[in-house]
Amino acid sequence: VILHAANRLHSIALHNILILPDFYLPGTDTKINPFAKVEPVRSVAARIIRLREIGQTIGEIAGGEAVHPSNPRVGGMYRNVTERARMKMFDLAKEGRQLATDQMEFMIAILRNFQKRDYCVVGNAKVPMPKELGYHNQGYMAVDPMYGTNSLAEYPTWQPQRWAESRPWDWYMGEMEIDFEDPSYPIGGTTKKGGKANPQMEACTGVPTYDGQPVEVGPRARLVKFKGYDEKGTVGQHIARQLEYVDCIYAILKSLDALNTSGKVLADPIPQGDGSMGWAANEAPRGTDVHLARVKDGRVQWYEMLVPTTWNFPTCSRALTGAPWQLAELVVRGYDPCVSCATHMIVVDDDNRIVAQKLIQ
């Protein structure tokens, strides 16, 4: 739980940096540049950076690596932390408590200000702001406020029999001609007209459903399922994420208080598997992350991952329905999708000199 909450704390702070340019300083028509050297933005950026440092440091102390650890230990951890390390994590979490509260309140104020606006400037256009931006009527899926569940739990909160998966070919539209372009759209204009797009062929993930329908996973889903949260739309999604700031800190403090630094860290024995399916559903920062496997005699026979962004893609497409196309990116960023928004490709020669580069979006 400590590693998990630290990772989520770091993720929320990073997402703040990504979304702040979408919004305005209250009382102005000035969009926020999180890297500007003027107040209040400079202090906000410093706070975000410190929250990321706190999350990463606690994660490294507790689990060896904060994000995407390269050497996981099946069945537990390699070693326990020392009492000194436990107290270090306590100190970091206590420092983060006020920072997280301040950042949560700042972000909610920014979001509420944006919600009151009549328009948003994108490129050279004043785009009317729909009051129902990002709304959808899909359900929500979450298995735990902070951690997760699995097939060995007495009362598992996820059921594999309710899950199904479709091919992109069966879900998305076929080939269409691009017949519109806007060179003023940031950055560098939209895709040139005259080309073709084919989501059926270009989509690279399956389409998972739960009870036959796409679902939303992530911060809002957790708050809907476990805390009675009910705000819809893109702003509601962003606010839900900010509300998890303080949850992360208190989850860390509570777990550190209960941590026995002399306790066992590895399951004994570790089952070698009989070929039947087992699964675990974990609440990652972006949402429910389900791993399913069949293991027999210590060897993996079959493995499948249902990651948060895969769950959210079809729901996000429903949330985009009816939105001004200029605000589509804003809606998508509410889901914090784990995909590359752009790839900076460089070509170097034998002397490591850049001979060509291109930004692929």
Task: State where each predicted segment sits.
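Active-site bordering "gate/hinge" segments
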Residues: 1-286, 296-297, 309-361
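Short beta-strand elements
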Residues: 289-307
